A protein has these predicted regions:
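Charged catalytic cores and adjacent phosphate/nucleic-acid-binding surfaces used
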Residues: 1, 12-58, 77, 93-94, ...
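Ser/Thr-glycine-rich phosphate-binding loops at phosphate-binding pockets of nucleotides
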Residues: 5-7, 11
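Divalent metal-binding segments
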Residues: 10, 87-98
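Active-site gating loops and adjacent loop-to-helix segments of metal-dependent hydrolytic enzymes
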Residues: 48-91
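Phosphate-interacting basic helix/loop segments used at nucleotide- and nucleic-acid interfaces
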Residues: 98-108
């Protein structure tokens, strides 16, 4: 792997530790968050530096309901340093929907200089397909799929694939390649604009009926 993105749900608070960890391992980091729109569709906001990602995460987090989070029921929501020491516990439930609509998330991401990518658009939960039934017209930088075809028309947008890993063992199960002199956020942005990024590990048409992970 040459580039790795950290996109926690509705927060980017772990971006500083992630930057240091990637520097240690010689991997180019992408920063961001997997936002939940007010329609309850997941959206990736990807950035080339921690600062805009942190601002994106701050606005997302502040828009979440203030209802108390139950760590016993749902597990801990922690911010760590580069040595995995816990420095903060987040009190708002990160799985909930933000106050931003899909289009509002796109404007915010672009305002901060990021890439606006609807996540796993063909899944049966928390996707534009499951929530809206179609991909609304908008200024997406790419569209993330888990299968080659079926369910939803992704239009003219570049299709990518990502691990969507919630445990280490799932990292790299799906991934995207693109040609560049060196891996960087700018090179990725150009590759998406020119449709020179290619998804790997997504399911074939014959696998569509199989359970999703």
């Amino acid at each position: 792997m040459h580039m790795v993105a950290l996109t926690d749900h509705n927060t980017a608070a772990n971006a500083p530790a992630f930057r240091i960890a990637c520097e240690r391992e010689g991997v180019v980091p992408l920063y961001g968050a997997e936002a939940t729109s007010s329609e309850e569709a997941h959206v990736l906001g990807l950035f080339g530096a921690p600062e805009p990602a942190l601002e994106f995460g701050r606005r997302l987090y502040e828009s979440l309901p203030e209802a108390a989070f139950d760590p016993v029921r749902y597990g801990d929501q922690v911010v760590v340093d580069e040595d995995e020491n816990i420095v903060e516990s987040l009190s708002r439930h990160l799985i909930g929907g933000s106050a931003f609509s899909l289009s509002e998330l796109g404007r915010l991401i672009h305002e901060l200089g990021g890439l606006f990518v609807p996540a796993h658009v063909d899944r049966t939960m928390f996707s534009v397909w499951s929530q809206l039934g179609f991909l609304p017209p908008d200024s997406y930088d790419a569209v993330e799929r888990t299968a080659e075809a079926g369910r939803i028309d992704t239009g003219p947008f570049c299709v990518i694939a990502d691990s969507d890993a919630h445990v280490p063992e799932h990292i790299g199960r799906r991934y995207t390649t693109f040609e560049a002199e060196a891996p960087s956020f700018a090179a990725l942005k150009t590759a998406l604009e020119e449709h020179r990024a290619f998804p790997h590990g997504i399911r074939s048409v014959t696998q569509l009926a199989e359970p999703q992970s």
